[in-house]
Design a protein with these regions (language model features):
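Second-shell residues forming the walls of enzyme active-site clefts
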Residues: 6-8, 19, 31, 45-65, ...
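Short, conserved acidic/polar surface loops in the N-terminal third of protein domains
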Residues: 81-91, 137-139
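Catalytic domains of carbohydrate-active enzymes, especially glycoside hydrolases
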Residues: 31-43, 113-125
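A charged helix-plus-loop insertion that forms the helical arch/lid used to bind
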Residues: 87-103, 146-148
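Short, conserved phosphate-binding/catalytic loop or strand-edge motifs used
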Residues: 131-141
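Preference for extracellular/luminal or secreted protein segments
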Residues: 1-36, 252, 262, 280-393
Length: 393
């Protein structure tokens, strides 16, 4: 008996994370929520104040209740921070954290503050930390977003950030698997390539991700980076490959299976933004990339801006699930994704009632301020003392 079409749509929609413009639930947002999208990502365009963010998230969660909605934000610190002064604590760049006298302590403090402030405004996940190793001075994407230039330094700081952030009830996300630190292309504009052998990747790029997994990280984000060294190498000491015919990591079964099987990560794997220029010329477009990612065991696909792209990904996933009559391919993968997403939600995602309580607490705080919850002078002092300087954006 064929499954009901709505079942396929529900399985597909829960794998789509969408973004939208505006400070409240608008028509675009409402449509994606009503379709059953499992996650939403906020940007600076969605932020006016802590009370407004908390209320926005509470309204989105109420709209989909009793289903849970994962709300995420890029709150790395430095140049990638959607929550900023004057309302939120200024978080320094990962480079500044890594340069502190006690980088592990500094990362722990920063992770604690990020987790505290995200939870206060009903955000369930921060897309941090970056666990790339900054080994290429010409890399315009990573640079000061990395904790350091060695795997040990990056892994130690990342582990401290993850544990502290998640102890506040906010999921962390290690990125950008399997390493974006030694690339020169900006994947926002073009497809990048990591030309190293598997042996080199195991020595430099992969160890910080191992540390992140050992720290219990809830999610790993996969980059739109070609990694020919992971595509069935003849030996671990293969000469460096330069072929550009390999798929992006976000669509590669070989790259994602290495994370799952060799690194031992059993949590949620998500793609980088499907609207990035890196996928602009991909065969089959965003839809085919999403289907390829599904078969590679990617659980969640980010489509951060255009409703058209979000629907393209959702519809392609739905069609793939509907075509899988015996349930051995796309349907099985989507069902596995649902279970991993549910496990993350059980651990970190607030439901509608808890979100409403958070929103009311901030809205009713004395004098209309929120310093008890976010932007506390004490937290600014803790960050400043740990990092040894006034944080710079």
């Amino acid at each position: 008996m064929m499954p009901h079409p709505d079942d396929a749509r529900a399985l597909a929609a829960q794998m789509v994370c969408f973004g939208f413009d505006g400070l409240e639930v608008n028509a675009h947002c409402a449509r994606m929520l009503d379709l059953g999208c499992g996650a939403v990502i906020l940007f600076a365009r969605n932020v006016a104040s802590p009370a407004q963010v908390a209320r926005l998230c509470a309204e989105m969660k109420r709209r989909v209740s009793p289903r849970k909605l994962l709300v995420m934000v890029d709150q790395e610190g430095g140049r990638v921070a959607r929550f900023r002064e004057p309302h939120f604590t200024t978080i320094p760049s990962a480079e500044a954290v890594g340069n502190a006298a006690d980088a592990v302590h500094a990362a722990r403090v920063v992770g604690d503050v990020v987790g505290k402030e995200c939870r206060a405004v009903n955000v369930d996940m921060t897309l941090a930390p970056v666990v790339d190793v900054n080994t290429n001075p010409n890399n315009v994407v990573i640079g000061d977003r990395a904790f350091g230039t060695t795997p040990d330094a990056v892994g130690a700081a990342a582990g401290a950030f993850i544990r502290a952030c998640q102890s506040r009830g906010v999921a962390a996300c290690a990125k950008h698997w399997p390493g974006h630190g030694d690339t020169e292309e900006d994947t926002h504009a073009a497809l990048a390539i990591t030309k190293h052998s598997l042996a080199r990747l195991r020595d430099v790029e992969i160890p910080p991700f191992v540390d992140a997994v050992k720290a219990g990280v809830a999610s790993v984000l996969v980059a739109h980076v070609q990694v020919p060294g992971m595509e069935a190498p003849k030996s671990e000491n293969d000469a460096e490959k330069t072929e550009t015919s390999t798929p992006p990591a976000s669509c590669s079964a070989a790259v994602v299976s290495f994370l799952r099987e060799r690194v031992g990560f059993g949590g949620v794997v998500m793609s980088d933004d499907m609207e990035m220029g890196a996928l602009a010329n991909a065969p089959g477009g965003v839809g085919q990339c999403a289907v390829d990612g599904l078969h590679a065991t990617v659980d969640l696909f980010l489509a951060c801006h255009a409703e058209r792209t979000q629907l393209e990904a959702l519809d392609a996933l739905r069609r793939a699930i509907e075509r899988d009559v015996d349930g051995s391919g796309a349907r099985r993968r989507a069902t596995e994704a649902r279970e991993r997403l549910r496990a993350l939600a059980d651990a970190f995602v607030d439901g509608a009632d808890a979100a409403e309580a958070n929103a009311r607490a901030i809205e009713s705080s004395a004098g209309g301020t929120t310093r008890e919850y976010v932007g506390a002078p004490e937290d600014a002092r803790r960050v400043r003392d740990a990092c040894g300087t006034t944080p710079r954006l």
